[in-house]
UniProtKB/Swiss-Prot annotation:
Species for this entry: Synechocystis sp. (strain ATCC 27184 / PCC 6803 / Kazusa)
Location of the protein in the cell: Cellular thylakoid membrane
Residue ranges crossing the lipid bilayer per the database entry: 109-131
Entry keyword annotation includes Thylakoid: yes
UniProt name for this protein: Thylakoid membrane protein slr1949
Gene Ontology CC, one term: plasma membrane-derived thylakoid membrane
Membrane topology summary: Single-pass membrane protein
Organism placement in taxonomy: Bacteria, Bacillati, Cyanobacteriota, Cyanophyceae, Synechococcales
Keyword terms of this UniProt record: Coiled coil, Membrane, Thylakoid, Transmembrane, Transmembrane helix
InterPro entries with a match to the protein in the record: DUF3318
Keyword Transmembrane helix found: yes
Matches recorded under Pfam families: DUF3318 (PF11780)
Residue runs in coiled coils: 180-212
Length: 212
C-alpha cells in the first residue's frame, strides 16, 4: 500500500513538472502548477495568489483519465486565459455589496436620505460588476478565444495545426462524455462546435493558399 502511494505521488510530481515545462518562457517565473487539494475541484483552473503570482491548479485524479495530447491542449487553454488576463479574481464587488447593503439598512434606521442613496448606489455598482463577471455569454466567449490561443501555443511547442485542433477536439469529446453536470457539458459542446468551425476555416484558408 505504501509503495503504491509512493508511486502515485511520484507520478503526480512528474506530471506537474511536465506541465510546468509547457509554460512559455515568459510565464515560468511567476506561474506555478500544483495539484488541487479541494474536495471535488474543477479539472483545471487558475487562481491569483498575489499581485505577481498565479497558480494553475489541476485535479490530478481526473487529469490522469485524459491522453497526454488532450492534457496539453487543456493546459494551454488555461495558459491562454492567463495571458489574456481573463482568469477569475477575488474582486472588491462582494465586499462592496455587503457594505452597501449594511449601509442601506443603517441609513433606513437613522433616516438619512443622502447616505441611503450613496449606499444603494454602491449596491448597484457592485451588483452590476458581479453580474458582468458571471455573465454566461461573456464567459463562453472568453473560453472560445482562449481555445484559439491554445491552438497557437501548441504550434509553438511543435504541434501542427491539424494535430492541435484534433487534440483539443478529442479532449472536449471526452469531457462531454465524463461530465454529469448539464450546464458544464453544454459549455463543452459549445466550445467544440466553435472549434470545429475554426478548424474548417483554417483548412479552407490553407487549401486556398496552396492553390495560389
Amino acid at each position: 500500500m505504501t509503495s503504491y502511494s509512493s508511486a502515485t505521488a511520484r507520478a503526480e510530481m512528474s506530471e506537474l513538472r511536465r506541465l510546468k515545462s509547457l509554460l512559455p518562457p515568459e510565464l515560468q517565473s511567476w506561474v506555478m502548477v500544483e495539484g488541487s487539494t479541494e474536495v471535488n475541484p474543477p479539472l483545471i483552473r487558475s487562481e491569483e495568489l498575489g499581485r505577481d503570482e498565479i497558480e494553475i491548479q489541476v485535479d490530478l485524479a481526473k487529469w490522469e483519465n485524459l491522453a497526454i495530447d488532450q492534457r496539453n491542449l487543456l493546459f494551454w487553454h488555461e495558459v491562454a486565459r492567463i495571458q489574456s488576463d481573463t482568469i477569475p479574481r477575488e474582486g472588491w464587488e462582494m465586499a462592496a455589496l455587503a457594505i452597501g447593503l449594511g449601509g442601506a439598512v443603517g441609513e433606513l434606521w437613522v433616516q438619512d436620505g443622502l447616505l441611503l442613496l450613496l449606499a444603494l448606489g454602491l449596491c448597484g455598482i457592485s451588483g452590476y460588476r458581479l453580474w458582468q463577471k458571471n455573465n454566461g455569454e461573456k464567459r463562453i466567449k472568453e473560453a472560445i478565444e482562449a481555445d484559439e490561443k491554445a491552438i497557437t501555443l501548441a504550434t509553438r511547442f511543435g504541434y501542427t495545426l491539424p494535430n492541435a485542433y484534433k487534440s483539443l477536439g478529442s479532449a472536449f469529446k471526452t469531457l462531454i462524455e465524463q461530465t454529469p453536470n448539464r450546464r458544464q457539458r453544454k459549455q463543452y459542446e459549445t466550445r467544440l462546435q466553435a472549434l470545429r468551425q475554426s478548424a474548417a476555416k483554417m483548412k479552407a484558408k490553407t487549401q486556398k493558399a496552396k492553390a495560389l
